[in-house]
């Protein structure tokens, strides 16, 4: 029997969401994504502590920020030895509301990759889908630096990213699901709100349909999954980035996977484009409590993990 993972790969580009690059080869993903939380998790494992220690040792007299950049590139370079495609490396979440500094940081990361012999076509710079992050992406894309827009929870964010010419977006399925489940509390009905009715799945389907209806080239990569059901319901999405735990479950499963999303079979097609000038963007995002709260929370979590990573580095000096 063909595994669920192999079936999924017939319809969707499978991406591994991890800093634990030793797990990559067995799943044969095309691309890989990282974020501050995943890098922090990886460097605390015995297998990866030597990378952290060597990076600190080699740059002991440099700033902590300087060392973190080189640590990100060290992980990205190792990942690119294993996968044929692209790796996503994230700009510090503390720059999420500063377009200029985000652009500057992206330039630094690209220069470090190029100095390591990695072509920029194999790199996606991850930026938070704030107004400022999207403006940074617009500038970077014009310079030939491809961007992956993360912490995306709403159609207005997706529309703004597409208008800015972003290479790729990462709508967060699981975190959307988490919010609605928490809001419902004891009234949550998993049977009613799971599968195709999962609010995170529905959000990605809506964004995918919007993009394909209006001919945007920006890639849609579902992210932040909690279950294999969420993944299977989005078979046919341009890309899906999946944790090693869920990749293993798909690998071990013989469940039949059928295509659920296709540009040739769009349902509930929108008739108008979303207004995305700055005032409209901010109002629409503010008007959607889930998106506003999860974006803010996501930035806080990634920023906090960046601080934890800094403390690990300081302890090794």
From Swiss-Prot:
Q: Name one Pfam family in it.
A: TAL_FSA
Cystines in this chain: none
Q: Which pathway does the database say it acts in?
A: Carbohydrate degradation; pentose phosphate pathway; D-glyceraldehyde 3-phosphate and beta-D-fructose 6-phosphate from D-ribose 5-phosphate and D-xylulose 5-phosphate (non-oxidative stage): step 2/3
GO biological process terms, semicolon-separated? carbohydrate metabolic process; pentose-phosphate shunt
* Active site positions: 126
The record's subcellular locations are:
Cytoplasm
Keyword Transferase assigned = yes
According to its UniProt entry, the function of this protein is described as: Transaldolase is important for the balance of metabolites in the pentose-phosphate pathway.
Its protein name is Transaldolase
């Amino acid at each position: 029997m063909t595994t669920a993972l192999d079936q999924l790969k017939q319809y969707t580009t499978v991406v591994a969401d991890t800093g634990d690059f030793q797990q990559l080869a067995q799943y044969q993903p095309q691309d890989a994504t990282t974020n501050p939380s995943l890098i922090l998790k990886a460097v605390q494992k015995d297998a990866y502590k030597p990378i952290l220690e060597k990076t600190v040792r080699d740059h002991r007299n440099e700033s902590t920020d300087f060392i973190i950049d080189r640590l990100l590139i060290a992980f990205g370079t190792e990942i690119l030895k294993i996968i044929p495609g692209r790796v996503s490396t994230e700009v510090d979440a503390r720059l999420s509301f500063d377009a200029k500094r985000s652009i500057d940081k992206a330039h630094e990361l690209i220069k470090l990759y190029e100095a390591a012999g990695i072509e920029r076509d194999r790199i996606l710079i991850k930026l938070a889908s704030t107004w400022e992050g999207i403006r940074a992406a617009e500038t970077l894309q014009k310079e030939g630096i491809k961007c992956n827009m993360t912490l995306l929870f709403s159609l207005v964010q997706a529309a703004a990213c597409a208008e800015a010419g972003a290479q790729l977006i990462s709508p967060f399925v699981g975190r959307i699901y988490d919010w609605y489940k928490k809001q419902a509390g004891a009234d949550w009905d998993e049977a009613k709100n799971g599968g195709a009715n999962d609010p995170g799945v529905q959000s990605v389907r809506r964004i995918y349909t919007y993009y394909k209806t209006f001919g945007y080239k920006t890639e849609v990569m579902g992210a932040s999954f909690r279950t294999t059901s969420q993944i299977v319901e989005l078979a046919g999405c341009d890309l899906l980035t999946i944790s090693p735990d869920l990749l293993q479950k798909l690998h071990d499963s013989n469940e039949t996977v059928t295509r659920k999303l296709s540009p040739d079979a769009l349902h509930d097609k929108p008739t108008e484009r979303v207004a995305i000038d700055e005032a409209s963007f901010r109002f629409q995002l503010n008007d959607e409590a889930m998106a506003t709260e999860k974006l803010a929370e996501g930035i806080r979590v990634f920023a906090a993990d960046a601080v934890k990573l800094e403390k690990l580095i300081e302890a090794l000096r």
